[in-house]
């Protein structure tokens, strides 16, 4: 059942009772140059469709507690966009986790670009030298994979497939006219979250290994083994979050972890931090910490400014919305913002579709360039398995 939560402009289709109708609404809004987002929160059986007929606006401040209900989107570097919830639909969905299926098998139809391979491993090697020289402790380098395929591409069908494949992720489809592309993500990483009871939450997510062993069997989280490099990489993110807490003299927090979690075809190390903002009378915490945390050590590096400068030098592509953040704010007095990982930018024209996948990895002194390359391959496959099958 679909519930109309807010007013729907008369220019939009009035009968919305199925995925097909949501598809019509998506196409109509895109034609009218409106902004929109469709999402499903982790482990949720509800999906939402938000429309802003103005196309959204850029923001100069992040006073989250003063925002109306809407959807916030920020690039890696730059001002965020805000989509106001002029129209907000909610629908219950049936979810089934896909385990041991084709979504977890290696892809054979994605050609490896040797030039990209050489460029990426070269800059990983250069990054290791910089770390050994003491210029920074950690840096996150990313790359892209571009794939073209013919025929019509259904954003909402892809969204539904991602929801089914990755029930523990935040799954989102997004369109902002000023950006001109559609974005899809299935991200495991919470950046800033606060529920209606005032419990604030953020996580440190880093360290990556395949969830599939050489025999094709799934590795359970409790059986994962982590190298010193991966443990240290995740520890950098934990220390970064705690340093942000110290900057605002926040001492009353709970830290749980690290523990191994399954995110699609990958395993990660995760530590969770929670704060009771009602007890502390600190309702402004989400907005304050959002400004301090982003971009985190998990998608940038340590120290932050040195890492950002190195990324600009090493990466040939613009990250755009990759490694930024996105999510609904002030819907039911809750905030859910996630790091935009496991993401793809989709451009359609003349019956063809071009998908640009983004993936990155944390480089430390103990990194191996070829292993880091393979990590990005696995991360790209998170979405490739769904969109290209």
Where are these regions (language model features)?
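Contiguous alpha-helical scaffold segments within structured protein domains
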Residues: 93-118, 124, 144-149, 203, ...
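Conserved hydrophobic core element of enzyme catalytic domains
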Residues: 284-389
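An anion-binding catalytic pocket shared by soluble metabolic enzymes
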Residues: 31-37, 41-44, 148-233, 252, ...
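A short glycine-rich, hydrophobically flanked beta-strand micro-motif that places a catalytic Asp/Glu
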Residues: 139, 170-175, 319-327
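A glycine-rich phosphate-binding loop feature that marks nucleotide/adenosyl-phosphate handling sites
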Residues: 175-182, 241-242, 258-266, 325-328
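Short Lys/Arg-enriched alpha/beta "domain-start" segment
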Residues: 2-54, 149, 156
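Conserved hydrophobic/aromatic pocket- or pore-lining residues that grip, position, or stack substrates
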Residues: 134, 192, 239
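Non-catalytic accessory segments adjacent to catalytic cores
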Residues: 43-154, 248-251
